[in-house]
Design a protein with these regions (language model features):
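Residue-level recognition of a conserved intra-blade site in WD40 beta-propeller repeats
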Residues: 7, 60-63, 120, 198
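Beta-strand C-termini and the immediately following turn/loop, strongest in propeller blades
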Residues: 16-18, 129
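Blade-loop segments of beta-propeller domains
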Residues: 1-9
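Short, solvent-exposed loop/turn segments that connect beta-strands within catalytic domains
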Residues: 6-7, 22, 36-37, 63-67, ...
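Asp-box/WD-like beta-propeller blade repeats and closely related beta-sheet repeat scaffolds
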Residues: 22-62
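Beta-propeller domain segments
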Residues: 2, 68, 75-224
Length: 224
């Protein structure tokens, strides 16, 4: 299952996950762009057994003078509380940075649910993330930032979730009160948030430093 595609410096990167028995594994392959044939080679492989991977959006990024890829990795077991998002030892529910030379990764940010959109705009990193039953988020990503899932969310738990597994009152609404980073904006109800792109300033004098955000539920574009 292909998750994301990135073209950079005449190379094409594809992220995907494969299933073996009861596990799913996250992979990235890369190929030099050639109109006759694409010969993909392994770029990054995770040996972590995941419940179901999602997202997989990639962006080129320079972190501490090292070139690499930022990669958003979500999990598919959305309706059940999980320790993965707050566990720094796993890549699940994280945005990771993969060094282009060493192919080693670090956890760049944590506490994500399903970060479907990822954009690097200069020094700013912007992510869009599906919330539960509402609470879709636009986040400004900072290094080692914690975005709260599954403890804090402006969404509500699905009916098939035992709310007592989360807390007696469901998800915490305020992120900052618990030491997490607040979203730049949260959509309640959900819009089925997807990728975000920057509109070139040359497009319109009225739309300077604006972004376009796509919505799956509404089949609409939002200008921000």
């Amino acid at each position: 299952h292909v998750n994301g595609t990135l073209i950079h410096n005449n190379k094409i990167y594809e992220s995907y996950h494969i299933r073996k028995e009861e596990c799913e594994y996250f992979r990235i392959v890369v190929a030099d762009i050639n109109i006759k044939n694409l010969e993909f080679k392994d770029f990054y492989s995770s040996n972590e057994c995941g419940p179901k991977y999602s997202a997989g959006r990639m962006q080129f990024f320079n972190h501490e003078s090292q070139d690499g890829l930022l990669v958003s990795i979500g999990m598919g077991a959305y309706n059940k509380p999980s320790t993965f998002p707050q566990d720094k030892k796993t890549i699940i529910s994280k945005i990771i940075f993969i060094n282009l030379n060493t192919k080693k990764h670090i956890v760049y940010s944590l506490g994500h649910r399903n970060p479907q959109g990822l954009l690097v705009d200069g020094k700013n990193i912007i992510s869009t993330e599906h919330g539960p039953h509402g609470g879709d988020e636009i986040n400004k990503i900072i290094f080692q930032g914690n975005y709260g899932w599954p403890i804090a969310s402006y969404g509500t738990a699905y009916d098939d979730v035992d709310k007592n597994e989360i807390s007696s009152k469901g998800y915490l609404k305020s992120h900052s009160d618990s030491g997490f980073i607040e979203p730049v904006y949260a959509f309640v109800p959900s819009i089925g948030i997807s990728q975000i792109i920057k509109i070139p300033n040359s497009f319109s004098k009225l739309w300077q430093n604006n972004y376009l955000l796509s919505s799956l539920n509404d089949q609409s574009l939002y200008r921000i």
